[in-house]
Amino acid sequence: MASQAIQLGTWVVALLMGAGGADGESASKLKQRADTLASEARALANPSGCEKVEECELAGFGHKPCGGPREYIAWCSRTTDVKTLRARLEALEKAEKAWQEAVGLKSNCGLTRKPRLRWEAGQCRAR
């Protein structure tokens, strides 16, 4: 009877450790997915090619735990595949939110100020 209790206790501990490892692994995969999407979005957002600021666009980039974008990204609408970029930005927001929830990430809930678009030296900039 005592050996059955020890075996059961060992099994429960192993199960709990395995579950924790799976959660950590899952969170790691969520973070990797978010990082990949962020890299892809940055690669898609081409700030060059516009001739005036009116051709530049701006969007939120990523997700803060309290909500809203963690930063903003600017690009030239003439040289950027806007539809693909917006889809990637939406996927990035969802991926970061899922990762943040999985790890219980908290934030100071500070507002990320929306920058103004600028056209400097032939490039769209968020300042």
List each model region and its residues.
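Bacterial N-terminal signal peptides that target proteins for export
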Residues: 1-10
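Bacterial N-terminal signal peptides
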Residues: 9-18
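Exposed, flexible binding/inhibitory loops of compact, secreted disulfide-stabilized domains
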Residues: 20-127
